[in-house]
C-alpha cells in the first residue's frame, strides 16, 4: 500500500519576499513539514520510531512556478524508493493543480549508539 501524505500549508507573512512570492527557504520548510507528517504516520503504522531513526544525507529541489500569498498550498509526500539502508522521499508543492516545486530527499537509517547505518525496517517497505 503506497503511503501518500497531503499536508495543507499555511504560508506565513515572512515567507514572502518583496516580489510577493514565497522564497526558496520557505519552500524547504514546507517540504520539512510534509516529511514530518510522513514519518509520524509511518511510525504510527509500524512502531519503528524508537528503534530506527533516519537522517537526511541529500536534498535536491527544483522550482517551477511562483507561490503567491493568495495561493492555496499543499505538500504531497511519498516514499519513492527504498534501498538496503536508505529511502528516497519524493515531494511536490502544489497550488491547486499547479506543481510549483519538487523535492527528492535521500535518508539513511542510522543507529546513533553504534554510529553505523542500519537496514531499513522491513515493515516500512510495504508503504512504497
Residue ranges and their predicted role:
Residues 1-74, 80-128:
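Terminal targeting signals and extreme-terminal segments of soluble enzymes
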